[in-house]
Design a protein with these regions (language model features):
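Short, hydrophobic/aromatic beta-strand segments
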Residues: 158-168, 306-309, 344-347, 865-868
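Aromatic/hydrophobic beta-strand junction motif of beta-rich domains
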Residues: 327-342, 856-858
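Catalytic domains of carbohydrate-active enzymes that cleave complex glycans
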Residues: 422, 426-439, 444-470, 474, ...
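Beta-strand-rich N-terminal accessory domains
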Residues: 22-250, 254-256, 265, 272-276, ...
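Low-complexity, Pro/Ser/Thr- and charge-rich linker/hinge segments at domain boundaries
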Residues: 177-181, 309-330, 390-432
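Bacterial N-terminal signal peptides
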Residues: 6-15
Length: 908
């Protein structure tokens, strides 16, 4: 099936589409299912009486909440619906073919076994696997000293060895948004994030509202989380696939996954064309009469923040990477391990990609310095004394200044499109790029992808222009000025008249009568995505306005702070147009402004710059308009609506305005909700990865419902978490998650500078999508948050996020290596230092006095002076000043010379 045919099928059946409401119909009625209630110290659970699969899993502390879809148990009662307690097996005899068995496909009566002692329920479920199963499968629910455990014993009942090449345990949790309001979803549904870390792997199940308790699914011995396989919807799966579920998957329901213990047989078949798996696929063999027991344990953490402490309390190995698991080759990283078993060895896969050097321990944690070579994915495999192995997944990148340069060069050359005969006004343009085809995408039936608007079409030029905020390049700036003047103004954006400043949905559209012969006849142009010229010209989608506002605002900042770079217009023109875009949004696209918008933080910066420039009338009007939105959100319990049924893109802007207007309780709720879908996990792919699973439909080449790794939500949701950390530097977890998301957005950039929309995490893909798509929304988030952080943690000691740290003679210094080198937070001082011109080479902090010395790069043609702003962000922090420095527009203007210069900041 081609990508476009698959796209047609998916877009026709997806539950929620941009701008569309969920289709609702009368609910059918179902017969109730008999259940057996069970109590353990931590849970109130229920098993289906007929199958002994899990029908309810409520924490004892809150019995009205259910981690599994118990409310839908009756409608999910038939054959083909998987539950916790089911099993998937693929086996073969020596030299034979693989055969699949699934306990949920055609259920048969189970044979109950005696439940004595700590056993809560037991059954032989072999009959549900079918008559040809070479294995006897017994399942037991156990109360193991107060911990709920699920165990399967597999016994080879034949006279020949049996190889188990695939073994999966369905993990069915209530992540379903369908037919629920936002309030109901936040109260009733949960998210699941995996740590695919072999013997140290686990699942964390967190409630949408961010409150505790959280659920952890932990492996028993011999039950590694080797892979995390999506259980596909039966109606759409390949013929013969029985490892499926009949529940619909779509934007309102991600679906369920297998805890995959063995995956070799999948790797040989379904995953044969995929990229490298998280772990080497394995199988195991049972001799005649031999048995093996596998199992998982269910425990609760009192809060999401207490997950790591709960892992330690349950004798699980815990890894903490600083600053995370994305390691540029010029940065030092650290790995802290707290483990019940001594470390036997640490290996790099591939060999030499990572080195982990033991350092002095940190209050019960083993510490390693981690350095990287090369580029791309790598793993540290940590073997413990008992033979168990923990996998920590890393991503190695170029030094970030090189990555920034690569992105700017690629987007303004390989993605640059000029054609005076282009019938859609895309001349010049920066268009979506197809990495597989090696060319820009001039037509796609999802017309916005080729139309420079919507996220899927604006992403590439937004990335190119956002890169200039801290790393302006004269050649790139010259092209971007043309892009704004010749294409954005007048084509994408209405230039004058009653709708001046309004933004169209797409420049590209479908009109075969007007453009005969233009459209690819092999593509289906009959779905709703192939907008007419009228629909493409609609001004009512507010989500498109921040993209254009970013373009104007960045060029304002460059023109204001880097003399001679921007020549098309004075700085005031760009700031005026950023303001005009904002007010046009409120006038021409008011409906969606009731929601937080992706990249909506740009409006806060525009307002602040209007104030700094003394443009009082404009600032007053913009503040009035934004306060209307904020006051509306303040009345809602969960003000995170979207054009989707649930989304992770509106929260950052909601948080920003709550903070701006002093609505701290609402800001706190927003932060808590973000932490429900934005985890810290020892994997570059999941650490700081804001949950998203549907946007490949709208911005990717391969349109699938699939967990996306480092879609633009990762970096955008890092923005509020960074702010929250700077307000409370005692909460290291906030910084770890934020930095994971911010750096996650760099992994999308390949060695040439191409930037992918997101990584396909499903094991049959495991590679970056070939379309650049909506990546630029995330790169904007990286551009405004790129910074270095210096802190002294009570457990881990002095740490640097984004920079290398040295200590000497009572002083601590950090050499920033982040992608901007224009922002620095000194946590012990609570001081946030930002530069709008110039670069920070080094900062030295003297804890005894609080003095901070900045070493600034020498002058360049575009940076003859540095523009330095300082802000104390904590309640206990003291204000800082730079004596003798000239103050201009709220910051210090510091002349730069031919050699690096120093600026001393002192607390008052």
């Amino acid at each position: 099936m081609t990508a476009f045919r698959l796209l047609t099928l998916l877009l026709a059946t997806t539950a929620t589409l941009p701008g569309d409401a969920q289709t609702k119909s009368a609910k059918p009625s179902y017969r109730p299912i008999a259940q057996t209630a069970i109590r353990t110290p931590a849970f109130r659970l229920a098993l289906r009486t007929d199958t002994q699969t899990l029908a309810r899993l409520s924490p004892a502390a809150e019995p009205g909440f259910d981690f599994v879809p118990g409310a839908r148990e009756a409608e999910r009662a038939g054959d083909g619906y998987v539950h916790i307690g089911d099993i998937h097996l693929r086996v073969r005899p020596p030299g034979g073919a693989w055969t699949d068995f699934a306990s949920a496909q055609h259920r048969k009566a189970i044979r109950r076994l005696p439940a004595t002692g700590t056993t809560l329920a037991a059954a032989d479920i072999t009959t549900s696997l079918g008559t040809a199963s070479p294995l006897r499968v017994e399942r037991r629910w156990i109360d193991d000293h107060g911990v709920l455990a699920l165990r399967f014993t597999l016994t080879n009942t034949t006279t020949a060895p049996v190889e188990i090449g695939a073994l999966g345990l369905p993990m069915v949790f209530d992540n379903i948004i369908t037919d629920r309001s936002l309030e109901q979803a936040h109260a009733q549904a949960s998210f699941v994030d995996p740590y695919i870390g072999r013997d140290a792997g686990y699942l964390q199940v967190t409630r949408l509202n961010g409150t505790g308790p959280a659920l952890l699914v932990l492996p028993e011995r011999g039950t590694p989380l080797e892979a995390y396989r999506p259980i596909l919807e039966a109606a759409k799966a390949q013929a013969g696939d029985i490892f499926t579920d009949r529940s619909k998957r779509g934007q309102t329901s991600e679906g369920f996954y297998d805890w995959t213990v063995a995956s070799k047989a999948f790797a040989e078949k379904e995953w044969a064309k995929a990229g490298e798996q998280w772990n080497v696929p394995t199988s195991f063999t049972l001799a005649p009469g031999a048995a093996r027991t596998i199992g998982v344990r269910f425990v609760t953490a009192p809060s999401i923040a207490a997950i790591e402490d709960t892992l330690v309390a349950n004798h699980r190995p815990v890894a903490v990477g600083i600053p995370g698991y994305v390691v540029p080759t010029d940065q030092d990283a650290a790995l802290f391990l707290k483990t019940p078993q001594p470390v036997a060895k640490v290996e790099s896969l591939p060999a030499g990609a990572l080195t982990a050097t033991p350092m002095a321990s940190a209050k019960g944690w083993a510490r390693y310095t981690v350095r990287s070579k090369g580029w791309g994915r790598a793993t540290l495999a940590i073997t413990y004394a008992d033979g168990s192995v923990q996998a920590v997944s890393y991503y190695i990148t170029k030094p970030l200044d090189q990555a920034m340069a690569d992105l700017g060069r690629f987007s303004t050359t390989q993605q640059w499109y000029e054609d005076k005969a282009d019938p859609f006004g895309r001349n010049p343009a920066i268009l979506t790029y197809d990495r597989e085809a090696g060319k820009v995408v001039t037509q796609d039936p999802r017309v916005w992808i080729s139309g420079m608007s919507d996220e899927g079409g604006a992403g590439s030029w937004v990335a190119a222009i956002a890169k200039q905020l801290d790393n302006p390049d004269p050649v790139e700036i010259a092209k971007l000025q043309r892009l704004v003047d010749e294409t954005i103004q007048g084509d994408l954006q209405v230039p004058d008249g009653p709708h001046a400043g309004a933004v169209r949905k797409s420049l590209f559209y479908y009109d075969p009568a007007a453009h005969p012969g233009y459209y690819d006849p092999t593509v289906d142009w009959k779905t709703w995505t192939s907008w007419s010229k009228k629909d493409a010209g609609d001004l009512g989608r507010a989500y498109n306005y921040p993209h254009v506002a970013i373009g104007h605002w960045v060029l304002y900042r460059v023109a204001r702070n880097h003399p001679g770079l921007v020549t098309a217009h004075p700085w005031r023109w760009y700031l005026d147009h950023a303001y005009q875009t904002t007010t046009a949004m409120m006038r021409d696209a008011p409906y969606y402004t009731q929601f937080g918008l992706m990249e909506g933080d740009v409006f806060v910066d525009i307002l602040k710059d209007l104030k700094r420039e003394g443009l009082t009338a404009e600032a007053t009007e913009m503040e009035r308009l934004m306060k209307q939105r904020a006051d509306h959100w303040r009345t809602l319990r969960y003000p995170f609506g979207s054009e989707m049924a649930w989304d992770s893109t509106g929260q950052p802007e909601v948080y920003a305005w709550m903070r701006y207007f002093g609505y701290q309780p609402q800001a706190d709720v927003t932060r808590q909700v973000i932490l429900a879908y934005d985890p810290t996990i020892p994997s570059w792919g999941y650490n700081g990865n804001a949950r998203r699973y549907w946007d490949f439909l709208y911005g990717g080449k391969y349109p699938r419902i699939e967990r996306q790794l480092h879609h633009y939500g990762s970096t955008l949701n890092a923005v509020p978490l960074f702010d929250a950390y700077r307000a409370d530097p005692s909460d290291l977890r906030l910084l770890r998650i934020a930095y994971g998301g911010m750096m996650g957005g760099i992994t999308n950039i390949d060695r040439d500078g191409f930037s992918s929309a997101a990584f396909h995490s499903a094991p049959d893909m495991m590679r970056w999508d070939p379309y650049s798509g909506d990546y630029g929304m995330g790169f904007y988030g990286h551009a405004i948050t790129a910074a270095s952080y210096l802190l002294n943690d009570p457990t881990f000691g002095w740490l640097g996020f984004g920079g290398n740290v040295d200590q000497a003679a009572g002083a601590v210094s950090i050499a920033p290596k982040d992608g901007a080198r224009t922002r620095l937070f000194i946590a012990p001082a609570g001081l946030w230092i930002t530069l709008e011109a110039g670069k920070i080479a080094r900062a030295t902090f003297v804890p005894a006095t609080g003095a901070i010395t900045l070493t600034l790069d020498a002058a360049t043609k575009i940076n003859p002076v540095a523009r330095v702003f300082v802000e104390t962000t904590t309640k206990t922090g003291r204000p800082y000043t730079a004596k003798g420095a000239h103050i201009e527009r709220g910051g210090y203007t510091v002349p730069l010379g031919s050699a690096p210069s120093e600026l001393t900041l002192s607390p008052s």
